[in-house]
Amino acid sequence: MALTQGQLSFSDVAIEFSQEEWKCLDPGQKALYRDVMLENYRNLVSLGEDNVRPEACICSGICLPDLSVTSMLEQKRDPWTLQSEVKIINNPDGRECIKGVNTEKSSKLGSSAGNKSLKNQHGLTLQLHLTEWQPFQAVRNIYGCKHVEKSISDNSSVSPVQISFFSVKTHIFNNYRNDFLFSTLLPQEQKVHIREKPYGCNEHGKVFRVSSSLTNRQVIHIADKTYKCSDCGEIFSSNSNFAQHQRIHTGEKPYKYNECGKVFNQNSHLAQHQKIHTGQKPYNNKECGKVFSHHAYLAQHRKIHTGEKPYKCSECGKAFSVCSSLTAHLVIHTGEKPYDCKECGKVFRHKSSLTTHQTVHTGERPYKCNECGKGFSRIAFLARHRKVHTGEKPYKCNECGKVFIGNSRLARHRKIHTGGRRYKCNECGKAFRTCSDLTAHLLIHTGEKPYECIDCGKVFRHKSSLTYHCRIHTGEKPYKCNECGKVFSQNSNLQRHRKIHTGEKLYKCNECGKVFRQNSHLAQHRDIHTGEKPYSCNECGKVFRRNSHLVRHRNVHTGEKPYSCNECGKVFSRNSHLARHRNIHTGEKPHSCNECGKVFSRNSHLARHRKIHTGEKLYKCNECSKVFSRNSRLAQHRNIHTGVKPYSCNECGKVFSKNSILVQHCSIHTREKP
């Protein structure tokens, strides 16, 4: 049975764009579009009658002698000018024409009953006269429509010209399907079967029947949305990544953490930082059980167990487990210090070192200890400080078994065993194990004391000394003993105090066998045996075993009494005297005797009292061998042998061997009866 004649419109082989889509194409894509359209149009025209002009459309009453498709494309004009310039009217038989244009082929090509005209988006319709319906079956088979099974080879009525046309159409589809988003080339009957458009574009909401059309659409969006950094030339596919990158150049850090005030240029960095304050460490190492806040830190830590060090320095051969460590190491060879402080001009190899240094000028200490409230400029310092409260000392010396809070302290301790003192002072020749110790020592020769107390004007060589001194004014004592609740201004004092509860006495004198809780006390004790007094007063020539005694003695000449009681205003030359005096106001007697329970306001009084229970008398007179429990009483006794009477009455000039006798004598003049 013969089928009605079919019509094929130009839109079946056209590549269509909306006006918005056309603007998205770059010049190269637009040029390719024109070339393809010219080829499509000329191929279709070549299938018509011989006398059809190359510039004339084979259409329903439409001929473009001056405004033809080829001339439009050859002039490189945009397809949108055609829509605005062409005026279409209806001719008497109801078909559309361009005003003032005639074609002798229009009635012949478009008069068959049942013909359908398909318009493209410009309002132009191209109709091709076909004698039978079978060629559409061939087209359907070419494009794989499962609803029609008849092949072109089954029907001998298809002419070579018609087969040639479908070959052209297949060629156009196969060659240009990846360059543009196509209007479908399938016949109208197959379009009926494919009415659903399940593939939607997220950019503008347009939907497509096949996934390849959506893919081609997304390629245009991606090509249109490439972002190039004008500062460094780096290219990004998303606007969000481009915006993040630009903050590197501008220094913008819009994400702020409210706890410590630290700012970040990415939200992910803020999320990582929050784990520092929360203490969250979700990443666990199965080898040793150590936990980490970030997966990257865990991966880096694992290399300790494997011993993997893939990053090697070409200069010295030293290997590193992470690339950043190698990068930091290379600066040592180049000597480069690109990061300079704008406040003081000091330069640094690493940005992190500069950031740490800047807290010296700002005084910023954003990392707070939850136990005692102490602030730190670096998170590493806070982590190390926390071990003071927990008592954790994870770093152990393999030589002697001594344990330490930090790895740096263990490294410094190891040099005791190795005897390495690489850092030598050019002034006096003294050698030190660490560079920081040498730097601190050099201040002795220069006399420089750069750290000044704002309250009293006292200056110090070291910042730590100033920090400890400031606690005298503030009364701050952040270190607390868990056994008795006593508080201290310095951690070293707390550690020293703890040995009272444990009874630990590690340091023993080889001369007399006496043991001490602190090495400094042992060193002071040794001077008793040697008789060495290296510290001399420039004013009176008096010599002392300890530098602290010399400093204390100088106050006698200057009359300086920098320590003042907040309760009564009384001033003292020594801080220990002030601390002792405060017990008068508080009535506190923190020192208790384990034998009888008697309490004392001073530790020295407790030590003196203990000798009552032990019967110990350590102080012996060399003249008569008499022994005393106190050194002060031995000193008084010596005056008997020497005849020295250092205590003089201001009223009558009478002298006495003891201060107590002088006080008793003075009551005669004042007529006081003690």
Swiss-Prot record:
Pfam families: KRAB (PF01352), zf-C2H2 (PF00096). It comes from Homo sapiens (Human). InterPro entries: Ikaros_C2H2-ZF, KRAB, KRAB_dom_sf, Znf_C2H2_sf, Znf_C2H2_type. Belongs to the krueppel C2H2-type zinc-finger protein family. Its main location: nucleus. GO terms for biological process: regulation of transcription by RNA polymerase II. One of its GO terms (molecular function) is DNA-binding transcription factor activity, RNA polymerase II-specific. Keywords: DNA-binding, Metal-binding, Nucleus, Repeat, Transcription, Transcription regulation, Zinc, Zinc-finger. May be involved in transcriptional regulation. A zinc finger (C2H2-type) spans 199-221, 227-249, 255-277, 283-305, 311-333, 339-361, 367-389, 395-417, 423-445, 451-473, 479-501, 507-529, 535-557, 563-585, 591-613, 619-641, 647-669. Residues 8-92 form the KRAB domain. It is found in: Nucleus. GO terms for cellular component: nucleus. PANTHER family: ZINC FINGER PROTEIN, ZINC FINGER PROTEIN 501. This is Zinc finger protein 534. CDD domains: KRAB_A-box (cd07765).
